A protein has these predicted regions:
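Short flexible loop/turn segments that cap and initiate beta-strands
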Residues: 52-80, 122
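Short beta-strand segments of immunoglobulin-like
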Residues: 33-39
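Enriched for extracellular/lumenal, surface-exposed ectodomains of secreted and cell-surface proteins
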Residues: 123-134
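Short beta-strand elements
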Residues: 132-146
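Structural beta-strand segments of beta-rich domains
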Residues: 43-47
Length: 146
């Protein structure tokens, strides 16, 4: 009689643990969309990032870009979606020197990949911070083509 009771108790505890884990999920939803996983070098690669609550309310957030190779961050850049696509600072990634603030949606048509990154498996990471709710990393696998 003790074994069925113990099995039922363990099953109930496991279900409670899973339910508790599900409610402890990230307090906001963030998505990253891009046109392709194989962008062309030295050409515009537009991206869109959205941030909202689970109920659909738009949230104010900040974003930075990180470039990851073999699990290690090799470069950090700051979004500047309003910069001229052909400007020197946009090509060098130095138009901004701080995280880019936005509400709900960030559309950046100015992301470009250098020719030296062609053929290398990289991850494009957008680090999203929402004040009071935490940070999320949005990773997107990329292999640049010439």
């Amino acid at each position: 009689m003790r074994r069925p009771f113990a099995a039922a108790l363990l099953t109930a505890l496991a279900l409670l643990a899973l339910a508790g884990h599900a409610t402890a999920a990230t307090p906001f939803v963030a998505t990253l969309k891009a046109t392709t996983h194989n962008p062309k070098a030295d050409a515009a690669w537009p991206i869109t990032v959205t941030v909202r609550s689970h109920s659909g309310k738009s949230l104010r957030a900040t974003a930075i870009y990180q470039f990851v190779y073999n699990g290690q961050v090799v470069a950090t850049r700051y979004p500047s979606p309003k910069a001229d696509l052909h400007s020197k600072c946009n090509k060098e990634g130095t138009c901004r020197h701080s995280a880019y603030p936005f509400t709900w949606r960030l559309r950046d048509p100015t992301v470009t990949w250098p020719a030296r990154s062609a053929g290398i498996a990289l991850k494009f990471r957008v680090v999203i911070k929402v004040k009071g709710l935490g940070t999320r990393n949005l990773d997107y696998s990329v292999r640049v083509r010439r």
